[in-house]
């Protein structure tokens, strides 16, 4: 299984599948569709049933049940890699029997346990790293490799009891659109798991409540030589507004269950400037208070302006899946038991972000998140442990077995 996973993963990361938040096409990049076509051919060759690729880039397939009266479950991963860092020409390095020392990434970069202490737990194991010029793509091609490997194992080992199992590989998860065209009804699962987490044992069923606030400053432009008493610089209005935001209520000062405001972007000219904030909190009441506080701050700032104006538009992005998952405790219990059966200690912690599962849970498909075995996603220091990928694959198989007992 280990060698098969390694080869499968190395094949997948050769596809550049970065998504593009500026492109409104679905998927946002054609390369994701090319990768999905490759996976479709692989699934057909492996004798998966009902293999379908939609024109939106959603790839689904089925492992038929071999026992009756068992809930249908699903496993989900995403095709795209983050637009944050280059995903072109990925040249993975395979480090066998890691010795605990610095790993040279190509010519100019280093992956060091002094900076990334998580490396220390993988001495003697096989790591896959970047060459320092791109991200690796473990997020989420490790998840794809693990799902296909696990479900193919079930197909070729009919002595393992399981119900109907569905898989889906989605486009554009990294830009928040992975669930936009997901057909929950046709997927036909009672619950599912995204395979999109990090270190071994991660089991996540809480995520941020999330919103985006667009604040627009309106000014008045004229020739700077005749600007006295006439010019109103929208950029100055925007900058002074941001100076009123709390300095410590930001991502770099928050952790665990802390929420935050994050200035994601600012741009403008004299006539018009925009500030884009993301708002995050795990607690729904505090989340609503954050949105209200920001709206009231804009109103107060406008009242103090003699000229110029700010407007605000707040849009919710996704909500904490906890409210949709906890009413179905067996979904979590089965995943925990599967890990424990394999000698894995479950690590239950909140996702300081979102997944396809957070939106799918509110679309009627409760969907916690499980580990892939990767670290340092979205950058040149990303790496994956192959032995951890094996454990993720075994966890998927064990979940299928335990679900067959849950009648």
UniProtKB/Swiss-Prot annotation:
Key words of the record: Aminopeptidase, Cytoplasm, Hydrolase, Metal-binding, Metalloprotease, Protease, Zinc
Co-factor remark: Binds 2 Zn(2+) ions per subunit.
GO cellular component term of the entry, any: cytosol
Keyword Electron transport: no
GO MF terms held by the record: metallopeptidase activity; tripeptide aminopeptidase activity; zinc ion binding
Subcellular location as annotated: Cytoplasm
Active site, per annotation: 80, 173 (proton acceptor)
SUPFAM superfamilies: Bacterial exopeptidase dimerisation domain, Zn-dependent exopeptidases
Enzyme Commission number(s): 3.4.11.4
Binding site for Zn(2+) 2: 139, 174, 378
The keyword Transit peptide appears for this protein: no
HAMAP family, alphabetized: Aminopeptidase_M20
PANTHER family named among the record's database cross-references: PEPTIDASE T
Reported function: Cleaves the N-terminal amino acid of tripeptides.
NCBIfam families linked to this entry: peptidase-T, PRK05469.1, PRK13381.1
Entry protein name: Peptidase T
């Amino acid at each position: 299984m280990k060698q098969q996973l390694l080869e499968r993963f190395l094949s997948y990361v050769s596809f550049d599948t970065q998504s593009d938040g500026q492109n409104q096409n679905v998927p946002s990049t054609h390369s994701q569709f090319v990768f999905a076509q490759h996976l479709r051919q692989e699934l057909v060759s492996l004798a998966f049933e009902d293999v379908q690729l939609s024109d939106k880039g959603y790839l689904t397939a089925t492992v038929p049940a071999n026992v009756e009266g068992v809930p249908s479950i699903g496993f989900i991963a995403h095709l795209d890699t983050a637009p944050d860092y280059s995903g072109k020409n990925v040249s993975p390095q395979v480090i066998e029997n890691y010795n605990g020392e610095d790993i040279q990434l190509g010519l100019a970069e280093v992956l060091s346990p002094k900076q990334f202490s998580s490396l220390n737990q993988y001495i003697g194991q096989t790591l896959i790293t970047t060459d320092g010029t791109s991200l690796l793509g473990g997020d989420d091609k490790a998840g794809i490799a693990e799902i296909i490997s696990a479900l193919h194992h079930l197909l070729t080992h009919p002595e393992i009891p399981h119900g109907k199992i569905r898989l889906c590989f989605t486009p554009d998860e990294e830009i928040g659109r992975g669930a936009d065209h997901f057909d929950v009804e046709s997927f036909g699962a009672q619950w599912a798991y995204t395979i999109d987490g990090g270190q071994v044992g991660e089991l996540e069923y809480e995520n941020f409540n999330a919103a985006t606030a667009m604040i627009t400053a309106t000014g008045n432009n004229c020739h700077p030589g005749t600007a006295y008493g006439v010019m109103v610089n929208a950029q100055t209005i925007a900058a002074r507004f941001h100076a009123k935001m709390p300095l410590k209520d930001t991502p770099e000062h928050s952790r665990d269950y802390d929420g935050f405001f994050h200035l994601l972007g600012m741009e403008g000219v004299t006539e018009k400037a925009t500030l884009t904030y993301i708002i995050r909190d795990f607690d729904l009441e505090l989340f609503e208070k954050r949105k209200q506080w920001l709206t009231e701050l804009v109103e107060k700032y406008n009242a103090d302006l003699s000229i110029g104006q700010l407007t605000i538009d707040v849009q919710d992005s996704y909500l904490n899946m906890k409210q949709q998952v906890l009413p179905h405790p067996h979904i979590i219990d089965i995943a925990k038991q599967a890990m424990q059966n394999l000698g894995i200690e479950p690590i239950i912690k909140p996702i300081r972000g979102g997944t396809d599962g957070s939106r799918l849970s509110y679309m009627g498909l409760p969907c916690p998140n499980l580990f892939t075995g990767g670290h340092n996603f979205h950058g040149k220091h990303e790496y994956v442990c192959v032995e951890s990928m094996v454990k993720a694959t075994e966890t998927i198989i064990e979940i299928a077995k335990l679900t067959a007992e849950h009648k």
